[in-house]
Curated annotation (Swiss-Prot):
Enzyme Commission number(s) from the entry: 4.2.1.-
Protein name: Putative hydro-lyase RPE_1692
Gene3D superfamilies noted in UniProt: PSTPO5379-like (3.40.1640.10), PSTPO5379-like domain (3.30.2040.10)
InterPro entries: D-Glu_cyclase, Putative_hydro-lyase, UPF0317
NCBIfam families for the chain: PRK05463.1 (NF003969)
Lyase found in the keyword field: yes
Family annotation (Pfam families): D-Glu_cyclase
Enzyme class: lyase
GO molecular function, one term: lyase activity
Similarity-based family: Belongs to the D-glutamate cyclase family.
């Protein structure tokens, strides 16, 4: 019997949609999470050995646009109670990526077999939070309309280095009409904890992107003739940096398959 089924049989209060989403992941549901548990904050994941944690924490502090930390575990502790009830970082994402010496070696649906007592988990803000605010203002979001993952690209924008961690910023892209893009800048500026305002509008080649139809992560989406690409700093940046640093061991989320927390998106707005 699942935890959710047992909870229902006990006649307890309804579970938060965020906890239901995590329990679904724990049961092996490996679906992309855009639009899942509306109203709740989602996060990117990076897990590193303790000896690298301080350098990575500093890297995030130096690069708050792509790497805004919303949660951090104690050493060896897979639970992050500040982010959610009964949250287990080893099982509660749809899919993970395991890295050794900068190479992707596994993409499991849980990391129980990979967990170690020296690991520290970092949860980094995700643009899915500000997408809710965009939708509330009737701004269309193409990848949600199509039911695919947001397209993400490595750029020529260099992150500030810290220890072994250095490399390019990764950005997510959403096509918008110019007037909608201006409104999107205004809306997302209210959410610095989840990447804030865009880092670039239009002209993808000027930030090192040669073909929008071939994202480095996620899925391509069509851009209409009356639209421009709008780029936000992205929490997949640590994956590019971890690969470039060739650290001996690391775990991340699979792009587009995030951790759903119990935090509310409205808690992250600054205005």
């Amino acid at each position: 019997m699942t935890v959710l089924a047992a909870h229902r049989l006990q006649g307890a209060e309804p579970l938060l949609p965020s906890l239901q989403a995590r329990l679904a992941c724990r049961a092996g549901n490996a679906q992309q999470t855009a639009g899942v548990a509306p109203g709740f904050v989602q996060g990117n994941l990076a897990i590193l050995p303790e000896k690298l944690a301080a350098s990575f924490h500093r890297f995030c502090q130096l690069n708050p646009k792509p790497c805004p930390i919303i949660g951090m575990s104690d050493v060896g502790d897979p639970n992050l109670p500040a982010l959610g009830r009964d949250l287990d970082i080893r099982t509660d994402l749809p899919r993970y990526r395991v890295w050794r010496d900068g190479e992707l070696v596994d993409e499991p649906t849980d990391i129980l077999a990979h967990w170690r007592d020296d690991l520290v988990a970092f949860v980094i803000g995700c643009s899915f939070s500000f997408e809710e605010a965009l939708l509330a203002d009737d701004l269309p979001i193409r990848h949600i309309e199509l039911g695919v993952r947001v397209p993400m690209y490595r750029t020529n924008i260099a992150c500030a280095p810290s220890g072994p961690f250095a490399g390019p910023m990764v950005v997510s892209m959403r096509p918008m009409k110019p007037a909608d893009a201006i409104r999107a800048v205004q809306i997302t500026s209210r959410f610095p904890a989840v990447h804030g305002a865009p880092v670039h509008l239009g002209l993808p080649q000027s930030i090192g992107i040669t073909d929008l139809a071939k994202p480095d992560y996620g899925d391509p989406v069509p851009i209409n003739d009356d639209e421009i690409p709008v780029f936000w700093a992205c929490g997949v940046t640590p994956q590019a940096v971890i690969a470039a640093a060739r650290v001996p061991f690391a775990i991340t989320h699979s792009p587009g398959l995030m951790l759903v927390t119990d935090l509310k998106n409205k808690q992250l707005a600054v205005l």
